[in-house]
Design a protein with these regions (language model features):
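Sec-dependent bacterial lipoprotein signal peptides
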Residues: 1-22
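Short alpha-helical boundary/capping segments at helix-coil junctions
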Residues: 3, 22-60, 88-109, 114-142
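Alpha-helical interaction segments
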Residues: 12, 27, 78-81
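Mature extracytoplasmic domains of secretory-pathway proteins
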Residues: 68-74, 78-95
Length: 142
């Protein structure tokens, strides 16, 4: 008789554990989106704001537009091409925020792109993680 009671108790414990495992927990983890995309009114562009964690995970780096040989220069890694073949870079008007800007590339020398037209010297641009910014803006790979 005692042997049957042990099996019955074990069965109740296992059934109880199974029932609690199937419960929906009200304290679900909060979903944090790594990027917030806000359309810029009056244009086709969007403002991409990343969380600190997203910047860390992407190992995102920035540099400034500088001048060399009387032309604006950016790292070649800053450039991204859209489906129409237009060339863009991501400027950073404020911390963790990026806005795509059209550029006209004159030529590339090594790891530098010399621009005919683009943002002013001193503008902060993304130099690493550019493809990921583009993907976030257009929800590519999501």
């Amino acid at each position: 008789m005692q042997y049957i009671n042990r099996w019955f108790i074990a069965l109740l414990i296992i059934a109880g554990l199974q029932i609690t495992a199937c419960q929906k927990h009200s304290e679900m983890h909060e979903v944090v989106h790594p990027a917030e995309i806000v359309k810029i009114e009056g244009s086709d562009l969007s403002k991409v704001t990343l969380t600190e964690k997203a910047i860390e995970r992407l190992a995102l780096k920035t540099e400034q537009v500088r001048e060399s040989k009387s032309q604006k220069v950016v790292p070649y890694s800053s450039l991204i091409y859209d489906i129409n073949g237009q060339t863009w870079i991501y400027t950073s008007p404020e911390s963790r925020t990026f806005v795509r800007a059209k550029v006209d590339v004159d030529h590339v020398e090594g790891d530098l792109a010399y621009l005919n037209d683009g943002p002013p010297v001193g503008t902060v641009v993304a130099s690493v993680g550019v493809a990921e910014l583009y993907g976030a803006e257009f929800k590519v790979g999501h």
